[in-house]
């Protein structure tokens, strides 16, 4: 019925989070696992193999297929899991799970109920970010948080913890080909748009999952901003028109507001990081926000299903 896939790079370095991610999947009635592991060593695959052996799960482990691209990305990892599922299994549902996401009790019941609807192609469990795993039991969904989550999903999709219908995946492969390998940050937006273009429904479940990445948190606390990376992948996503504004007028008005907020942001960052680094971080953050808002507006005005095909699509599957 169900195949579980995990997309990871150095997941074992996340320690307890990674192990709890694995344990939480036991609520799902799967017998087979697909591990797409682009790690720097074999520590992650060893942890997953130990888990699979302990719980009687069949494990198929591999690195990403590159599909003619120069390196592994989140898009190649996700597409590899999809292709392995379509090629090697007859099950109707593929679950894709990121390595820092812990499913909350009841996640599978909600996903299974959603996919009983024959027109539903994707189920996404809302992810609740926490700074400390001890906060996991106290997460509450208030109105503001719910609105922010829904707006973000409708703008650019989410794939942290998703259940996908086989026929929807096969239809996407046939109509649009592979997820563009260059979409390292926005492969989730592409997948959502492809689902919608083919008329498949998407359901968000609010039992959801906890997301906690200790590596990213430590970088954020140190003031690490990967602005060049964010800018590059936002520009790449713009080619496909997959990031789209939900409230067009609001996003247009917020373009100048983002610039107006720069002095306050600079003050806050320099207080925390010092004058030179603080200014650099504030400018980088503002640049990223401006470009993202512009791309959202552009996507809402010009995005279409015809833009989804990868520009360098291969003639045969690798």
Language model features by range: what are they?
Residues 90-102:
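Short beta-strand-to-loop acidic/aromatic patch adjacent to the donor-nucleotide binding site
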Residues 181-193:
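Acidic donor-binding loop at a coil-to-helix junction in glycosyltransferase catalytic cores
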Residues 123-136:
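Short beta-strand-to-loop element that shapes/binds the nucleotide-sugar donor at the catalytic cleft/hinge
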């Amino acid at each position: 019925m169900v195949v579980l896939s995990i997309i990871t790079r150095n997941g074992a370095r996340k320690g307890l989070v990674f192990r709890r991610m694995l344990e939480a999947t036991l609520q799902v009635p799967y017998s087979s696992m697909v591990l797409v592991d682009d790690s720097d060593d074999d520590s992650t695959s060893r942890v997953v193999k130990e888990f699979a052996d302990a719980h009687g799960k069949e494990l198929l482990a591999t690195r990403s297929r590159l599909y003619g691209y120069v390196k592994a990305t989140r898009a190649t990892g996700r597409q590899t899991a999809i292709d392995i599922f379509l090629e090697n299994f007859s099950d109707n549902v593929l679950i894709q799970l990121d390595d820092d996401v812990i499913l909350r009790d009841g996640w599978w019941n909600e996903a299974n109920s959603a996919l009983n609807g024959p027109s539903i192609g994707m189920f996404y469990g809302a992810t609740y970010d926490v700074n400390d795993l001890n906060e996991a039991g106290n997460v509450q969904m208030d109105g503001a948080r719910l609105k922010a989550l829904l707006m973000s999903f409708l703008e650019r999709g989410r794939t942290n913890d998703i259940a996908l219908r086989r026929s929807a995946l096969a239809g996407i492969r046939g109509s649009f080909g592979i997820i563009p390998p260059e979409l390292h940050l926005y492969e989730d937006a592409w997948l959502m748009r492809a689902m919608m273009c083919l008329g498949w429904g998407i359901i968000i479940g609010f039992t959801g999952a906890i997301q906690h990445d200790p590596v990213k948190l430590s970088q954020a606390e140190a003031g690490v901003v990967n602005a060049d990376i964010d800018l590059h992948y936002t520009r790449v996503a713009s080619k496909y028109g997959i990031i789209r504004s939900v409230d067009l007028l609001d996003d247009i008005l917020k373009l100048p507001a983002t610039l107006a907020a720069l002095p306050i942001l600079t003050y806050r960052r320099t207080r925390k990081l010092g004058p030179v680094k603080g200014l650099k971080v504030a400018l980088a953050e503002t640049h990223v926000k401006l470009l993202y808002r512009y791309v959202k507006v552009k996507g809402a005005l010009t995005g279409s299903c015809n833009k989804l095909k990868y520009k360098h699509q291969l003639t045969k599957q690798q």
